[in-house]
């Protein structure tokens, strides 16, 4: 009998994983403070990593990688892409971005002496001078000059401003209490018809204890309810596809898709009929490349291969597609929620791939090693 503890009662994904484990009859749930467990389904931000792997004779597995915030916080992701040897020169799939600290945090400002591609040496270096250099050059060249400011730890569409005025963006950040990222706004996105609407794409990615990377075959488009336009960047419902913003502010929420969600099968049909292309050939190949590039760049820093405990983690990668069908990474979520209709399959995959590979069912010795569930693709 294996044992597990649950330290995050708010995760709907791990509530389902917990239910699936108990249903096998091979797992027993312990009190959250019991130190002698096989599996910890923990909270993302306060996991006691230092206490893991010290129980004699007990293999321990936890559902997060220590240090994964290098990918999952917006400012850290920008720094990673600019400083990682694997990404710095070859990354063409991430919008031009700058890390900006509010002036009240008294963070050193990096002088813009190396053009617009700053080498970030300090963990807290403000890049506003580099941003202004790039902004002014685009203005002189007559290029599109719309940017989006996003709180590094923000979620659900909070802490966001879209503007073509540099002073407005910087003033907005300076009145906040935390680091932000200023990122080039994708002004010509691929739009859905009917409705001339924006969308983004959420893909779920599972990394197991051996750092094998699995992409969940199903994904979801989170769609806007209102027609896209560039006349008013304060109109959240046409620019931001966050579920909570669409539901709260748009009278057309649910008009085109139930819950403003379109799944991959329907999206593939749309691409085939409207553009004579397939999802796999035009978009998914790019998504797979970006996911592998990101996760492999942080592997040396977060892998648990030589530690006394093991980790796995579910990630949510968010993408946008421009009118030229180029895929752009927007952000990575380290504790993603899941569309309701996908819970059962996604969570069963977590059990089969990430947990049963470390703690096999008692009858597994009589069975040959099973391939990953068909719902997941090993990258």
Swiss-Prot record:
Keyword Nucleotide-binding: yes
GO cellular component, as recorded: spindle microtubule
The TTL domain, residue ranges: 3-370
Reaction catalyzed: C-terminal L-alpha-aminoacyl-L-glutamyl-L-glutamyl-[tubulin] + L-tyrosine + ATP = C-terminal L-alpha-aminoacyl-L-glutamyl-L-glutamyl-L-tyrosyl-[tubulin] + ADP + phosphate + H(+)
GO MF annotation list: ATP binding; tubulin-tyrosine ligase activity
Short name of any one Pfam family annotated for the protein: TTL
Domain of life: Eukaryota
GO process terms (BP): microtubule cytoskeleton organization; protein modification process
InterPro entries for the chain: TTL/TTLL_fam, Tubulin-tyrosine_ligase
EC code(s) of this entry: 6.3.2.25
Cofactor: Mg(2+); K(+)
UniProt keywords, alphabetically: ATP-binding, Ligase, Magnesium, Nucleotide-binding, Potassium
Alphabetical list of PROSITE patterns matching this protein: TTL
Function summary: Catalyzes the post-translational addition of a tyrosine to the C-terminal end of detyrosinated alpha-tubulin.
Membership in a protein family: Belongs to the tubulin--tyrosine ligase family.
Oligomer and partners: Monomer.
Protein's UniProt name: Tubulin--tyrosine ligase
């Amino acid at each position: 009998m294996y044992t597990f503890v649950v330290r995050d009662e708010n995760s709907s994904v791990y509530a389902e994983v917990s239910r699936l484990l108990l249903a096998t009859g091979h797992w027993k749930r312990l009190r959250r403070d019991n130190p002698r467990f096989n599996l910890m389904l923990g909270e993302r931000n306060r996991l006691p990593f230092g206490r893991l792997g010290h129980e004699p004779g007990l293999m321990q597995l936890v559902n997060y990688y220590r240090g994964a915030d290098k990918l999952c916080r917006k400012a850290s992701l920008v720094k990673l892409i600019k400083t990682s040897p694997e990404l710095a020169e070859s990354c063409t799939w991430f919008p031009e971005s700058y890390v900006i600290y509010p002036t009240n945090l008294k963070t050193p400002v990096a002088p813009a002496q190396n053009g617009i591609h700053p080498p970030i040496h300090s963990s807290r270096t403000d890049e506003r001078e580099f941003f202004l250099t790039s902004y002014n050059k685009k203005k002189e060249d007559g290029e599109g000059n719309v940017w989006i400011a996003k709180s590094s730890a923000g979620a659900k569409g909070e802490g966001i401003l879209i503007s073509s005025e540099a002073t407005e963006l910087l003033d907005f950040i300076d009145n906040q209490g935390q680091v932000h990222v200023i990122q080039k706004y994708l002004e010509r996105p691929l739009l859905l018809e009917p409705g001339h609407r924006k969308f983004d794409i959420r893909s779920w990615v599972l990394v197991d204890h051996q750092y094998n990377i699995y992409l969940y075959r199903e994904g979801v488009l989170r769609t806007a309810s209102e027609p896209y336009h560039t006349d008013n960047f304060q109109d959240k419902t046409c620019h931001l596809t966050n579920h909570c913003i669409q539901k709260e502010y748009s009278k057309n929420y649910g008009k085109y898709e139930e819950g403003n969600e379109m799944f991959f099968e329907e999206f593939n049909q749309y691409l085939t009929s409207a553009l004579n292309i397939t999802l796999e050939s035009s978009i998914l190949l790019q998504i797979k490349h970006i996911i592998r590039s990101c996760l492999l760049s942080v592997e040396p820093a977060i892998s648990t291969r030589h530690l006394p405990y093991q980790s796995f983690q579910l990630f949510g990668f968010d993408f946008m597609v421009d009118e030229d069908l180029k895929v752009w990474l927007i952000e990575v979520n380290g504790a993603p929620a899941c569309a309701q209709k996908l819970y059962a399959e996604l969570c069963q995959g977590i059990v089969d791939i990430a947990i049963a590979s470390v703690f096999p069912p008692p009858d597994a010795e009589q069975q040959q090693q099973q391939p990953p569930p068909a719902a997941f693709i090993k990258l």
